[in-house]
Each structure stands twice: as C-alpha cells, then as structure tokens.
UniProtKB/Swiss-Prot annotation:
Binding residues for substrate: N108, S134, G135, G136, H191, N192, Y196, K266, R293, R458, H464
Major location category of this protein: plastid
Protein's organism: Arabidopsis thaliana (Mouse-ear cress)
Subunit structure: Forms homodimer. Forms heterodimers with PGD2 or PGD3.
UniProt-recorded name of the protein: 6-phosphogluconate dehydrogenase, decarboxylating 1, chloroplastic
Domain of life: Eukaryota
Lineage, opening ranks: Eukaryota, Viridiplantae, Streptophyta, Embryophyta, Tracheophyta
Protein's gene: PGD1
Positions of NADP(+) binding: G13, L14, A15, V16, M17, G18, N36, R37, T38, V80, K81, A82, N108
Classification via NCBIfam families: gnd, PRK09287.1
C-alpha cells in the first residue's frame, strides 16, 4: 500500500458513538480507517460517510488490514464494551502493530484496567491512552468533551486531531492532557457521578414544582426555559424544558407522564461512590442520586409499600402542602435551592478528584477540567466557568463551598434552600439530593460537630482513645466505672 493512501488514524467499534466519532474525525479533514467485527457496521459507516459529504473514511474488514492501513506511528481508537472485549480487541490488533504505535480506549473503563493495559502495552513497545468521551451520540458527531490520560507521547501524536474534533468554547477546544495512568478514565468516571447528581437534583426540582406547586408540564417547560437563560443555563436544564413539551403520540397529554419511573444505569455512578468511600471523601449528593436509582428500580415493592402503609393509616400526603402556595415564590425558591445544591454536588466531585490526584500524583488541573466540561459534554453549563475561575484564583482551594464567590451565593440562597427542603418534607416528597447537599453544607460549615460524643462512645466500648480540645495527646477513660461511681 502506498504511503499516500494510508489513513492518518483508525477507529474500531462502530456502534453509535464509534460511528459518529469516526465521521467527526473525517469531517475535520483527517482520513480515517474504520473496522468492526460485525462487518455490516463498516458498510453502514461508509454509506453515512458518502451521504454526509463524501468524507475520507476507509472501511477495513480484518484486524490485519485495519492496522496496516494506518500511517506510522499508528494511532488506533477503540470504542467497544468495557472489560474483556477491550482486551480481546487489543490482542487482535497488537499482533500487527509495531513499537511506537498507540492504542486509545475511548470507552467508560475502570481506571485500574487502563493502568494494567498501559503496563502491558509498554512491554510490547506500544503507547496507550485511556480517553473519556462525553457528549453522547450528538457530542461524538459534532464535538465531544475529551479526557485523555496515559502516555503523553500518545496524546502528542494525535493532539492536532483531538483539538479539531473536540467541542469548541471561547477559551479553546474541550480537550486537554489529563495526566498519567488511568487519570483520563477516572476523571470521566467522576464527571458521570456529577452527572448523576445533576439529574437527581433536577428531578427533585420537578417533583416539588409539580406536586407541591401543582404546575403543569406546559408551565414547567416555560420555567426551565427561563432558568436556562440564567445561572442554571446548562445542557440538562435545556433538554428538560424540551422533554416537558413533547406530546404522547399514543394518547392525550405529554409523554413524560407516561414513562415508567425506573431509572437505568451503566455503573460509573456506583464506581464514583465506591471510590469516594475508598478515599474517605464525603460525596452524599452523588451517593443519594445512586440510591434513588436503586430505589426507583423497586417499582413493584414501592407500589406494595404504598398500599400497605395506606392500609396502616398513613394519609396520602404527597402534594398536600399545595393549598395556599405562592407559586411565583416557590419557583424562585426551587431555582435557588437547585443552584445551591448543585454547588455542593460539584464540590464533592472536585474533592474526590483532588484526593485521587494526591494519592496517584497525577497533578490534575481542576480549573482546566472545568474548562473542558464547558462544551460537548452532558454536564456542560455556564456554571463551569465559575468553577474554572475559582480554581484559577486558588489552585489549592479546599472546597468550592469556601471559594469567596460561591460562599457568598450559598449564603444568599440558604433561606430559600431551607424553605424548599422543609416544604418537601412536610408534603411527603423525598428530595434526597437537596437534603444531602444541605446537610453537607451545614456539616462542613460548622466549626464544632457532635462527633465528640461518637468518639466518647468508641472509647467506651472499644478503648479507641480520643483527643482533647484543651491539651495534646491520646486519652482513654473508664467511662462505665466513672459513671456508676458518680451516679
């Protein structure tokens, strides 16, 4: 094969994300080879390339032909299901690869798998990147947020491609070299955990407005549209306003009311919560959002619980607080509660990233992470520019909660926040995300907590000792003996 005919890059795994990313790369002027084990997907991609502008896409039908169709040093992106399929794909291609060639895994992979593969690739003289890709199918086609971590040389080899393919915002393309090892995958995992929190908080805002405020879907669509022109401007708020407007094609009313209330998940939210526990980082908002997905899955149990508790005398309280509600004030209160809760959720995610960065010596740039999330990805929001500036002001910021700008905003919003949570509790509406965020804020801001009593209990039953506030050292007390003596 003549050198001139070789592709600049290759992509294997032509499900929706893979196809769209390949076409995005080709559209930016980079000839690309594509491969899929099910060859009909190759033909489908070639057909789309022809229709979408005669894009420079070369279809390959065997691992050998695929690898050899790419110019050296070769860069191969793989977008297949995480876990064993990635290892199988790497094995199929590495047989034909040469030292200096690079593999980029663009899936949602567990970061330790990426670190293992980096080590295995190095033994073969190959370079390896684990790259988080956010934005869904639309982002993949028109500009995603990209989070590559691993070999810097591998990143440098395709930096020009990634910078053209990524979403573009006013301060640059939404891609940056994240760091060594599995940092790219870890950052994408936490991004997804934050996404869980965002979606949960929005659903709670909807629940309160609908069931306490009695707002219609039409009114909700207008409210979310209005919110999307202010501090809450974001992809998720924008699409939420669209969702409320869609009519049900099979019946009366809006489609949203006909959707079964069971939430699916892929596992990255669970990984985020597990890592938070592993690193002793409090992430209650993200954990609450995960718990809610688990509980939503218990549809039959929930329906039975509603019946049993009603028969036991529990009055139907959901929405009971709606009489005499000032709707305009409620809408404004919920907006403020959503924003304040969101700050806490992002603070938890960023603190988890900071803890992992310290543990692994990744030297993550938190302001830069916020910047590359401003476009292309699911959590893109104007709010992220504020986070970027907070970390520019103080790269060692302990928490977004104590950034002077965010602190001021939270103090201004706390009265509305408390009203919303209190109202929801009175109305029997669960708002675990907002409650967790408020409890996190109230716990974090207190100079003294009742943890002194917990330490005393631990010392009594387990002789775990305690520290004192007035003198140094570790102390143990014979609590039971002294209590009985003094009784």
């Amino acid at each position: 094969m003549e050198s001139a005919a070789l592709s600049r890059i290759g992509l294997a795994g032509l499900a929706v994300m893979g196809q769209n990313l390949a076409l995005n790369i080709a559209e930016k002027g980079f000839p690309i080879s594509v491969y899929n084990r099910t060859t009909s997907k190759v033909d489908e991609t070639l057909d789309r390339a022809a229709v979408e502008g005669n894009l420079p896409v070369s279809g390959q039908y065997s691992p050998r032909d695929f690898v050899l169709s790419i110019q050296r040093p070769r860069s191969l992106i793989i977008l297949v299901k995480a876990g064993a399929p990635v290892d199988q794909t790497i094995d199929a291609f590495s047989e034909y690869m040469e030292p200096g060639d690079c593999i980029i895994d663009g899936g949602n992979e567990w970061y330790q798998n990426t670190e293992r593969r980096i080590s295995e690739a190095e033994q073969k003289g190959l370079l390896y990147l684990g790259m988080g890709v956010s934005g869904g199918e639309e982002g993949a086609r028109n500009g995603p947020s990209l989070m590559p971590g691993g070999s810097f040389q591998a990143y440098d080899n395709i930096k020009d491609i990634l910078e053209k393919v990524a979403a573009q915002v006013e301060d640059g393309p939404c891609v940056t070299y994240i760091g060594e090892g599995g940092s790219g995958n870890f950052v994408k995992m936490v991004h997804n955990g934050i996404e869980y929190g965002d979606m949960q908080l929005i659903s709670e805002a909807y629940d309160v407005l609908k069931n306490v405020g009695g707002l219609s879907n039409e009114e909700l669509a207008e409210i979310f549209t209005e919110w999307n022109s202010g501090e809450l401007e974001s992809f998720l708020v924008e699409i939420t306003s669209d969702i409320f407007r869609v009519k049900d094609e099979f019946g009366d009313g809006e489609l949203v009311d006909k959707i079964l209330d069971k939430t699916g998940m892929k596992g990255t939210g669970k990984w985020t919560v597990q890592q938070a526990a592993e690193l002793s980082v409090a992430a209650p908002t993200i954990a609450a959002s995960l718990d809610c997905r688990y509980l939503s899955g218990l549809k039959d149990e929930r329906e039975n619980a509603a019946k049993v508790l009603r028969e036991a005398g529990l009055k139907e309280e959901i929405g009971s607080a709606s009489s005499g509600i000032d709707k305009k004030r409620l809408v404004d209160d919920v907006r403020q509660a959503l924003y304040a809760s969101k700050i806490c959720s992002y603070a938890q995610g960023m603190n988890l990233l900071r803890a992992k960065s310290l543990e692994k010596s990744w030297n993550l740039n938190f302001g830069e992470l916020a910047r590359i999330w401003k476009g292309g990805c699911i959590i893109r929001a104007v709010f992220l520019d504020r986070i970027k500036k907070a970390y520019q002001r103080n790269p060692d910021l302990a928490s977004l909660v104590v950034d002077p700008e965010f602190a001021k905003e939270m103090v201004q919003r706390q009265a509305a926040w408390r009203r919303v949570v209190g109202l929801a509790v009175s109305a029997g509406i669960s708002t675990p995300g907002m409650c967790a965020s408020l409890a996190y804020f109230d716990t974090y801001r207190r100079a003294r907590l009742p943890a002194n009593l917990v330490q005393a209990q631990r010392d009594l039953f387990g002789a775990h000792t305690y520290e004192r506030t007035d003198r140094p050292g570790a102390y143990h007390t014979e609590w039971t003996k002294l209590a009985r003596k003094n009784h």
